[in-house]
């Protein structure tokens, strides 16, 4: 079935390419007229060979626009007359899909590079230091030159984090990946060391930080631990920390590093809910209800990139995660926030979600 679908898409593209206006100039030479569309398809196949390259994004959007246009054209054929004529003029012999794709690529790049600060205001009945707590979440940085975040943008990222004046800084995984060069790792570890967070800095591993999905990374676990230790960042793996101010931070191992058999939420907090405000860090947005039942007050996750490329990213992430992006109320006392990522995965392109840091401001409710 996948092969038949691919053949059908190839045929659709070929027939549409035959309608391109420039080809009409060589219509009297069959070899050129029927051969040039094949060359164009070969070019698209070539630039799409890298699953992490922009070529596959470009080709995917182009094919999508051609499919939509063909479906509309076939529907209008049944009607005929003026609507069909107007459609042919609008479609301009197949040029419109190229213009739409170019527009999407331009907009997606701008959206990916725009670093936002997304603020959430929450309340709790539990006591907080001075009645308030500000948490900044950095997630899914994936630093590399061809992605949205690399060392050249560290000053901008640092300024946005410092503007929030965080009490607590949390890093929810995929801060690095298998494409991260040692220079990038050192630069970002230095950044985290320069940031001030009076209640501490905590980090949980993501599925890319140490796992080799695409290639052998240029750094190992020892390099990661050494860099974070120098920066004053504590790594949490199925561990909880009770801070002197009474706030608890729980960090979970990612599913990938436990073969799906990590500690349960109840095992991490065997005493269940208590009077300590509990910040729950889990790279992948799963198991929300069990975390809330165990005593989590605020769950912070990443991983999804908010979908990043619509609709493929949204469909893929929704299938495995309980939330794709944003805030979700889990229980009366518990909320979850899923970051869209402080960087992008693979390329400087985003049509869904935001490139962001999350600033969660929690205040203690006053009793009436």
State the predicted function of each range:
Residues 1-113:
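Non-catalytic terminal accessory segments
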Residues 75-96, 100-164:
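N-terminal signal-anchor transmembrane helix
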Residues 127-368:
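Soluble catalytic domains of enzymes that build or remodel membrane lipids, polysaccharides, and related
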């Amino acid at each position: 079935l996948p092969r038949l679908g691919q053949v059908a898409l190839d045929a659709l593209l070929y027939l549409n390419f035959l309608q391109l206006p420039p080809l009409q100039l060589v219509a009297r030479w069959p070899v050129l007229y029927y051969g040039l569309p094949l060359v164009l398809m070969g070019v698209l196949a070539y630039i799409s060979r890298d699953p992490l390259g922009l070529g596959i994004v470009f080709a995917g959007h182009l094919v999508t626009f051609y499919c939509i246009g063909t479906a509309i054209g076939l529907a209008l054929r049944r009607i005929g007359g003026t609507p069909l004529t107007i459609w042919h003029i609008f479609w301009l012999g197949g040029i419109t899909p190229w213009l739409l794709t170019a527009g999407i690529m331009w907009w997606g790049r701008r959206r990916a590079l725009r670093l936002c600060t997304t603020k959430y205001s929450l309340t709790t009945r539990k006591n907080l230091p001075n009645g308030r707590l500000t948490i900044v979440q950095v997630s899914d940085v994936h630093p590399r030159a061809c992605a949205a975040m690399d060392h050249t943008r560290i000053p901008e990222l640092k300024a946005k984090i410092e503007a929030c004046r965080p009490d607590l800084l949390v890093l929810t995984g995929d801060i690095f990946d298998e494409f991260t060069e040692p220079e990038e790792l050192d630069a970002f570890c230095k950044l985290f060391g320069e940031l001030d967070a009076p209640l501490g800095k905590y980090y949980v591993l993501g599925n890319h930080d140490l796992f080799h999905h695409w290639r052998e990374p240029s750094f190992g676990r020892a390099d990661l631990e050494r860099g974070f230790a120098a920066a004053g960042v504590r790594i949490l793996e199925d561990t909880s920390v009770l801070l002197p101010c009474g706030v608890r931070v729980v960090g979970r191992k990612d599913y990938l590093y436990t073969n799906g058999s990590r500690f349960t939420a109840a095992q991490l907090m065997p005493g269940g809910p208590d009077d300590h405000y509990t910040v729950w860090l889990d790279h992948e947005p799963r198991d929300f209800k069990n975390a809330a039942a165990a005593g989590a007050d605020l769950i912070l996750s990443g991983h999804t990139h908010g979908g990043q490329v619509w609709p493929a990213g949204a469909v893929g992430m929704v299938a495995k995660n309980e939330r794709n992006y944003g805030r979700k109320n889990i229980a009366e006392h518990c909320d979850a926030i899923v970051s869209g990522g402080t960087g992008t995965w693979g390329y400087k392109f985003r049509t869904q979600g935001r490139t962001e840091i999350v600033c969660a401001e929690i205040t203690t409710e006053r009793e009436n």
